[in-house]
Each structure stands twice: as structure tokens, then as C-alpha cells.
């Protein structure tokens, strides 16, 4: 059997198609694959983040919490400094819906106070015949909404002529629930401001160290090592103790924010430096240099956006440390001071063992602190996993 030998220039009979390559012949071209191939980095992060259910619920909780601090005056049943002299160290009241088997609606029982002559303690007892229905969207204590205009409307109020202390009162007869709501405004915002300051310092210092290298990088690394070798709490205490006692509450607030922000930038700076050490040798950086771009433009426009998602996730995980730092300083009496109210200041009421034993509801402000810390940790873990390209 003989076979014809192709002449010079004749196409070989290989199984090769001259038609354009169509990827759909190999991979199914579904709508999901098409959307995935066209999705931006932020959309891909969102799709990955949605799979972390705990992080999604934590994020929703934090969003609602930060929205609530905008209307603290409306949510709180009483003003921040409203005193009820007849209800000092009153225990929490329970909300009831039924009385003698009949539906009445949300109400609290009235109370009467007697003095225990054995230990001189105030003893409060519910009066079952004194039913005090709760009022909603009602007129209560007068407040100045964000210091701009006067208002009287509250979400919930006690009955006319009655009292309502769902989380009890403190030694001055002030409602603990109202003070927790007002204190959230300080405790939550001081963490954001501190992180914003450390975010800027970490990006600027770490970016310059990683991009330029050399002596500047060496000096920055030694400074970071010295700062990280000092325990955080003693350093916070030392810096907080040097603030003059004559400062106004606003200046103290700003001072605590600066202290927390200036001492927490080291970890972020190292992360930025390590990223820029790897990215500064890329071709697009060389192209930007040849086109005459300066150092700030190259770092801010070309390098930082490449891993901004990682920076946001890292910053989110540092907010709980800021909140704990403010709470610890205020609890020890070296942070914020009255009349400013934060969760740390509320916990100063419970520094005595005898107070905790007799009035345990004064420890209730620890609950929102723990919930916020856990929510930020879960939310930050979700962001970090969503921003990780190797997952």
C-alpha cells in the first residue's frame, strides 16, 4: 500500500481547525460564568463575604449600632444627667404583657421603697396593683439634638407620673440604660477616629519605607521595633497621665484619640512596607517612573490600591483594640472624665467589690463592650477572608 507524499507547500492533514478558538466549546458559557468573568474586585469580595454568614450578621449589627448613635437622644428614655433621687440604686424592672391572665400590653409595675434598718440598704418591691403602661413615641425629658435644636420626643417613656428603669439606676439615681445609649456615642467613635489616624500614619510611613528603602527604611524599622517592644497598656497609662487635669472634656477626648492612634500604626506600617517591597519592582511602577510620576503619585495611585482591601480588613480588626484601650483608660480614671460619658466611665461605678455584690446591674455596660468586640472581630475575619486571593 502506497501513500501519497505531500509536495512542498501543501498543508498537512492534521486535525487542526483554522476556525477562531471558542472557549465555550471547552467550558460551559453559563450566565454565572459570564458574570464572574466580568465582575470587579469589589464585587468578587462581596460575593465571597456573603458566604460568611456570621460576618454578615455582625456587619449588620455594627451598622445599626452606628446609626443608633446618631439618634441617641431619641432612643434614650431619659436625659444623660436626669436624676431620680427616690430611686437610688434601684434594680432593673421587667416588662410585662399580661396581668392576672389578661393581656394589658407592655407595662411595668410600680415600686415602693423601704429602708432595711439592719444594713441601711434601700429595698424596692413591686406593687402588683400599680400598673404603669409604657408609652411609645412620646413626650419626655427635653434634650438638644446634637446641640442644634430642642426636642422632647422619645422612643419609649414611662407612664404619666411613673418611672421606668429597665436596667436599674446608679448611685445618683440615673438610668443605666440611657447612660449606656449615650456612652455608645463616645466609645464607638473614638475607635473609628483612632483607626483613621493610625491608618494614615501606617500607610504614609510604611509606604515611604517600603518604596524608598535604604537608611530611611532601616530607621523606621528600628522605631517600630522599639514601640512594639513596649507593653501597650503601661504606655497608654503613661501618656494619659501627662494630660493636664485642666483640659476640657473635648480636649481630653481628642488627646485619648491621638494617643490610641499614634501607638497603633506600627503593625499596619509593616504590612504596607512588605507589600511595597514586592510591588516596587513591577513593570508598571517602572513605566510610571519613566513617565515622570513622583513618589506620592506612584505610592498613592499605583501601589496602595492594589492591596487596599487587605488594609481595610486589617484596620477593621484594630478597632476593637481601640475600644478596649479607651474603656481601660477610663475605667482606671486616666482617660475620659465626667461629664463625658462612655462605657469605660460607666464601669468605674463597679470598681468596688461591695458595689458589685450589692448592685450587680452596674456591670451591664460590659455586655455591649463584649458584643461590639466580637462583632468587629467576626466582621474583620469575613473581610480578611474575602480579600484573600488565595482562598
Q: PLM features: residue spans?
A:
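Gly/Trp-centered helix-boundary motif
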Residues: 1-199, 203, 208, 299, ...
